Amino acid sequence: MTRQNTDYGYDIQKVYLEMFMTDAESFVRCQGVFDPKTFDRRLQGSAEFIKDYVEQYNALPTFDMVNAATEGNLKDPGQLGENHYDWLLQDFETFSKHKALEAAILKSAD
């Protein structure tokens, strides 16, 4: 099920990053479409740090590490159920498609 006209603003993008940081399996599954440039400007530094850290150390950084390195404000969402991560995977896929389409439209306008 693909949702239309969804607002992929700062708050939901922040939730994506916070949830990815608590579940390595979900991050790995989305790593192929995880592009820090698609995130809100205020979150790009955190997204880039997470991506680079995972590539270099093959593990997720801590919230303190990301926040200290990027002056971010990511918070641990606490214990989440499997259904929460199912939502994350589905919603992040839709977000990624939306951002790819948005980029293609902007590129074609140039």
What do these predicted regions represent?
Residues 1-96, 100:
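Noncatalytic partner-interaction/assembly domains of nucleic-acid and motor enzyme complexes
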Residues 106-110:
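Conserved P-loop NTPase architecture
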